[in-house]
């Protein structure tokens, strides 16, 4: 994971 806000939101959208 890099940023957290961006990757976190993407991860949340995927899951």
From Swiss-Prot:
Specify the superkingdom: Eukaryota
Q: Which UniProt keywords apply?
A: Cell wall, Secreted
User: Record's Gene Ontology CC terms?
Assistant: extracellular region
Secreted among keywords? yes
Which locations, inside or outside the cell, does it occupy? Secreted, Cell wall
Q: What is this protein called?
A: 30 kDa cell wall protein
Q: Which organism is it from?
A: Phaseolus vulgaris (Kidney bean)
